[in-house]
Structures are given as C-alpha cells and as structure tokens.
C-alpha cells in the first residue's frame, strides 16, 4: 500500500512539474528591464524585451547588439540619457529578424539642449550620436517617438531594414542644434523608410552609399532637405537604385539635392525624386553639385563621380525670394541620362552659375 501511495504521489508531482514547465518557459521568453546594465546582461535570455523607463548612465550605450534572431524590443515609458561629452552612440541595436517598437505613449528623449552649442559635429562640445542600426538585418523599426538628439539621429548600415512611422523631433534645437541629421545611410541594401516625420537642423535623409533604398511619405521640416551624398572619399562610393517619393520638405535650407566630393571617384545611378512638394526653402529648391571639399562647395566641379539615370518628376513648390530655384553644377560629361518632368520650382532667383547641365534638364 505504501509503495502504491508513493507511486501516486510521484506521478502527481511529475504531472505538476510537466504542467508548470510551459509557464516557466513563457517567463523566460518575456523580460522587462529597468536599467541599461540589466538589459545588456540579460538581452539574449529573452525573445521579447521591454525597456521600462530606462535612464542610461552618462557615457554609456543602451547596448542591444547581438540579439537572438527574432527578438522583439519594446520601448516603454520614457528613455533618457545622462550627460557626458563623448562620441556615442546612445543606443545600438543589431541582429536578424528583430522588431523594434514602442508602447503607447512612450518617448525616447536625448535632451540634446545639454550639448547644443551651434557647432554640431564641427567643434565645441563632443556630442554623442543617437541610434546605431548597424547589422540590423531583415528587421524593422516601427513607431518610435524620438526627441532632441544631440547630433545625428540614425546611422544605418544594414540590409533589408524597414523603418515605419518614426518621428524625430528636434524642433527645440532651432537656435543651437546643428548636424542633427535624421537618417544617414551608408553601405546598406534594401532600406525602406516610410512615413517619417522629421524636425531637425541638417539632412532629413542623407544616402552616402548603398542600393535599393526608398524614402516615401516623409515630412521634413527645418533641415537641409532630402540628399544623396555627399558621395565620394569613403571606402564605398556607390549609390544606386534609390526612390524618394511622395514627401514634403518645408522651412528647410534645401529641397532635394545630390552632392558629390571634389576630385573623388564613384557612381550615383538610377535615382528618382518623384512627387516632392517644397515650401519655405531658403537656399536651393533643387540642387546637384559636384564640388564638395571638406564638407563645403568650392564652385569648381569635377567629373570623377558619374551621376546618371537620374529622374526628377513632379518636384514642385516655392523657395524664398533670396533663394535659388534650381542649381546644377556638374563636371564635364559626368551628368548623363536624366529624366526631367513636371519640375516647377518658383519664387527665387535663376542661377547664372550652372555648368554642364544634362540634356532635358533646366537650370
């Protein structure tokens, strides 16, 4: 009888343990972290990571690199960062099939005013870059609300990354913010940015190298516009198969532009600007320049970088009266095979300094 009772008890306990196992596994699948240190140490033990009101210590990165395949990252509450002069980044995420998103009402606030001094990355305080999406492959970033980046917002070096409905609001930096690029893309393929809303003080989009890149349904306010480049002078100097469409650029220095580096070699090909609306542009509505040296135009173009297969279609709107509607400064023979349709930019001056304007385009 005692043996029978023992067997029954053992069976009952065994059944309970089996029943409990899925509950224990589920707990391991979902983790909530309230510190950057815990997130870094525990990031590979969870398939869903919730970052709850994290205060990242000064001089440290919220390190979410090397995540397990298929991990979901959720920003919850307010994510903030301690102050220190350093290069950053403040956030870094890498992995494959990663989903980065946020809970309702969440925000990520860089409090960039602590660094802003009007110098950006050119001097003054050393300012940390914000978000590295490097080797974040076959992944997505959705719905993030980002405020007040000290300098650059996203640095993207990935393959097959979709960024949807992200807001970067640096409107508080109108006076002292500088070089607050929203999306800088290099050495990447199949990057899709859809529905971005950007208030900043530099490029809304800057593609330095890469292929199969789209930017659609964007709103860019206060910065330097939608840019290819500057291209040249890096290890990768090819930009190809890019579509920038259905977007608005307002209250910005430039509307749409392509800029290449003086004396450099490379390729810009199969780039399309389509259905872009401009207003309140203060420098150039549409600009192509092949004269950049040390980040500034020289006025003398070179032809080592070819700019071919370019389409400007239905790029329309207005610039300020002291701005220039269109400026094209190409090297000899380097700008070819352009399609120019429905381009109407008015309100400013007509440039007398255009050179080597390709057939079909108008300056």
From Swiss-Prot:
* Catalysis: reaction(s): (1,4-alpha-D-galacturonosyl)n+m + H2O = (1,4-alpha-D-galacturonosyl)n + (1,4-alpha-D-galacturonosyl)m
In the UniProt record, which is one GO cellular component term?
A: extracellular region
Q: Does the keyword Repeat apply?
A: yes
Catalytic residues (positions): 202 (proton donor), 224
Query: Which keywords accompany this UniProt record?
Result: Cell wall biogenesis/degradation, Disulfide bond, Glycoprotein, Glycosidase, Hydrolase, Repeat, Secreted, Signal, Zymogen
Do you know which Pfam families this protein is assigned to? Glyco_hydro_28
Give me the PbH1 repeat coordinates as residue ranges: 158-187, 188-209, 210-230, 239-260, 268-290, 302-347
Q: Where in the sequence is the signal peptide annotated?
A: 1-20
- GO terms, molecular function: polygalacturonase activity
Disulfide bonds, paired cysteine numbers? 31-46, 204-220, 330-335, 354-363
- InterPro entries referenced in this protein's UniProt entry, alphabetically: Glyco_hydro_28, Glycosyl_hydrlase_28, PbH1, Pectin_lyas_fold, Pectin_lyase_fold/virulence
Subcellular location(s): the record lists:
Secreted
UniProt propeptide residues: 21-28
Q: Which SUPFAM superfamilies match?
A: Pectin lyase-like
Residues carrying a glycan:
162
Q: Which GO terms of type biological process are on file?
A: cell wall organization; pectin catabolic process
Q: What is its EC number?
A: 3.2.1.15
* Family indicated by similarity: Belongs to the glycosyl hydrolase 28 family.
Which PANTHER family does the record match to this protein?
ENDOPOLYGALACTURONASE B, POLYGALACTURONASE
Biological role stated in the UniProt entry = Involved in maceration and soft-rotting of plant tissue. Hydrolyzes the 1,4-alpha glycosidic bonds of de-esterified pectate in the smooth region of the plant cell wall.
Q: What is this protein called?
A: Probable endopolygalacturonase A
The protein's organism comes out as Aspergillus parasiticus
